[in-house]
Amino acid sequence: MAQIEQSSDQGMMVEDHLFYLPATMTERWNYTEHRLGTVTATYDDCPDFTWQITPSDSELISLSDIRLELEVHLTRADGTPLQTEDCVSSVNNLLHSLFQSVSVELGGRSISDRSNLYFLRAYSENLIGFCTDAQKSQLTSAGFIIDNNYTAPYNGVFIPAVQGGTKARVTFNSSGAHQRAEMINQIYPLQLRGRIHSDIFQQEKPLLTGVPVFIRLTRARTALSFTAVDSAHLPKIAIRNPRLLIRKFEMTPAYSNAWAKQLMTRKCYASY
């Protein structure tokens, strides 16, 4: 019944299949994509973001294909644009470093880890769970830039003299930090996209019909996500247009019949 995608005829793979291949695609029929906004109002200092995926009677949700998209607007604390001498840079894996925890509920029951170490889990999984090619291409959309050591004198920028002193050099501790600083100075706003690092979104099982999904991401402190020449120059962060990319699909007749045949003889248990 199942046909491995790798053994199929050659063709152009979709974006999310460049570094991830589902075991089988035979259960999918007539899939659609949706972008969902938050269920609550958002503002620049919003402490958390909440989404609710309403249940469907006929479509399954592809859990491994759910993606988070958002825009990051950075300014000085007084609202003026950032300057080069502020030496603002982000930590690695910026998209996920903006949040300290993720909460996922299925049918009103929490199934996620309640710890406030979401950013550490996301960084660890991106660092050891993907090949170097993926880290240099696909993961850059989430602000992941590999850190390498820099050697003087190419590792800093001069800032103006303060109170009659001489110019000072501010150094970045890695080439990745320098590249992220250049990205912040050249791109406004920063558009980031990536997967949500939670157990339920790391499996090939689709979500059964009739089950509502509730997702909440809680913001982290600015000092956890960004560095600057000093604490007074840390940027003001505004997260705007947060969206979830959802892929739904209808079951093929063969896949649906296989389920129905099993349900005739035994109970169906779905674990996530």
Task: Report each predicted region and the residues it spans.
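Short, low-complexity Pro/Thr/Gly
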Residues: M1-Y272
